[in-house]
Amino acid sequence: MKTMIVKATLLAGLVVGVAGAAWAQSAADAIAQRQAGFKAIGAATGEVKKALDAGGDLTAVAAKAAEISAYGKRIPALFPAGSGAVGGAKTRALPAIWENKSDFDANAGIMSREADKLEMALKANDKVAAAAAFAGTTGQCGACHRPARAPQ
């Protein structure tokens, strides 16, 4: 009986240890993935802005808006509970994200839909609509950054 209790205790400790390691890895992975993703959509946004400022053919950067939209759809999953600045993690994500997760997720969805509008305008080479959609997309980025991202 005593041996069974010891074995059960050791097994429970092993399960907790493995689960803890998996959680730490998944939190670190989430942080790394979202940082890489935000860097990529920042670059995509810059390319769209450059094309808008140049005033030429916009169709060449329509795929960049699609990248922004696709990433917007992934954002909610990249902010699982416990993936903030805990345990020395290097992230600018503020607790407000998880305190108001439904609002945060909704803002990501809005950003994605704004980027869809941007993609359509770019594909149509409609400079006026593209400029308006670009403002909508980047404005929505700011709607999340202000309450949810710590300054550098």
Predicted features along the sequence, with ranges:
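Processing junctions and N-termini across compartments
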Residues: 18, 135-138
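Bacterial N-terminal signal peptides
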Residues: 9-17
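Sec/Tat signal peptide C-region and signal peptidase I cleavage site
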Residues: 18-24
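Bacterial N-terminal signal peptides that target proteins for export
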Residues: 1-10
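The canonical Cys-X-X-Cys-His
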Residues: 137-149
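Short Cys/His-rich "knuckle" micro-motifs
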Residues: 152
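Extracytoplasmic c-type cytochrome modules immediately beyond a signal peptide or single-pass transmembrane anchor
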Residues: 27-136
